[in-house]
Amino acid sequence: MGSKTSTNMVALLLSLLILIFTLSSQVKVVEATSRKLANGRPIVWTPASRSCGASHASWKKNNGPCKRPPRTAPASYNSP
């Protein structure tokens, strides 16, 4: 009787581990209705970056204003 209970417990734990691994390895696919890629592939979710203009609730440290490179005129504007 005791071995049957332990076998059931091992089977349950193994199935839970497989389920957790499967769910954690999935990639979030964003269903985009307004924008589609040219080749028709779905847009894959990527984590937000800490670049200029990006914000996230867990970022509490403020490093000051964004430093962006100065704007330069395109070559067509410089021609006479």
Swiss-Prot record:
GO biological process: response to salicylic acid
Signal peptide limits: 1-32
Functional description taken from the UniProt entry: Brassicaceae-specific phytocytokine (plant endogenous peptide released into the apoplast) perceived by MIK2 in a BAK1/SERK3 and SERK4 coreceptors-dependent manner, that modulates various physiological and antimicrobial processes including growth prevention and reactive oxygen species (ROS) response regulation.
Presence of the UniProt keyword DNA-binding in the record: no
UniProt name for this protein: Precursor of secreted transmembrane peptide 7
Keywords recorded for this protein, A-Z: Apoplast, Cell membrane, Cleavage on pair of basic residues, Membrane, Secreted, Signal
Tissue: Mostly expressed in roots, and, to a lower extent, in leaves, stems, siliques, seeds and flowers.
Upregulating conditions: Induced by salicylic acid (SA), mainly in roots.
Subunit structure: Interacts with MIK2 (via extracellular leucine-rich repeat domain); this interaction triggers the formation of complex between MIK2 and the BAK1/SERK3 and SERK4 coreceptors, and subsequent BAK1 activation by phosphorylation.
GO MF terms, alphabetically ordered: LRR domain binding; receptor serine/threonine kinase binding
Region annotation Disordered: where it falls in the sequence: 49-80
Organism whose genome encodes this protein: Arabidopsis thaliana
Motif SCOOP motif mapped to chain: 43-56
